[in-house]
Structures are given as C-alpha cells and as structure tokens.
C-alpha cells in the first residue's frame, strides 16, 4: 500500500484526535494532518492529501466558515482525484445521499462505531481503487490486443494480395 496522506477536518478537537489515534494505530504508514476548518484544509493542499475525512458541519470554531458540504463541493471541483469520507453526527439518509451525490466516497455517522466504520470505509476505498486500477489495466490490454488483431488481419490481407499466402 502506498503511503497515504490523510487530512482529518473536524471542528471537534477531541473527536479529531481520537480519529487520528485510531487511524494511526490501524495504518501506521499514513501521514495524518488535522484541521478544524475547510479553509485550513484548502490552505494545506500543497501536502497532497489522498484522503480527506471531512465533518459535515464544521461550524463550532467559526460560524462564518465554510461548511463540510461546501468544502466537499470545493474539493471535488478542484481536486477530483482526492477521496473524501464524510463524517457527521446526523443520522439522516438525505444528508448521506446528498454527500455521496456531491462526490463523497462514503458517509459515516459519529457515534460508538464511527471509528470502526471509518476503518471499514478506508478498506472499501482501497478495494475500490484496486478494482479501478485493474479495470484500467484490462482496458489497456484490450486496446493492445485489438490493435494486434487488426495488424494481423492487415498483414494477412497484404500476404494474400501479394500471393505470399493462398
């Protein structure tokens, strides 16, 4: 597994620290950064995050700050290659659906099982990436084989036309 750079963006410092501790214990090769606002997250994109764990609200520190949903929309417009896992205290299906529609890979409800669910979301994400990688590899192989077959057919036609084969 490549070294992942993970941003945890959560305005609840205790929850962010617990999330960092949990992820660091499960994935010791991850480089993890914590931010309390979407703006801080955006200001640190030069660290090239591969995954962002993003709180839905983000309004405890600064009421005028960008919400988690607004941050998600901004990230997906500007950095579509970054995978985002949303976390929220809201156990509402419409909120989860909205986040996924806006580009979140998964949605985790804060609570007793949040850390395990986040870990499961990471594992699902890694499997998804592997499938995407395999698909790209097979598409490339398919193109190569297609061009090889076309080349063989063209050579056979040339050989027939020149009388090399009957």
Role assignments for model-derived ranges:
Residues 2-23, 34-41, 51-52:
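Conserved acidic segment of CheY-like receiver
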Residues 63-81:
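Short amphipathic alpha-helix used as the core "switch/output" element in two-component signaling
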Residues 117-129:
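Receiver (REC) domain switch/output surface
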Residues 134-166:
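C-terminal single-pass membrane-anchor helix
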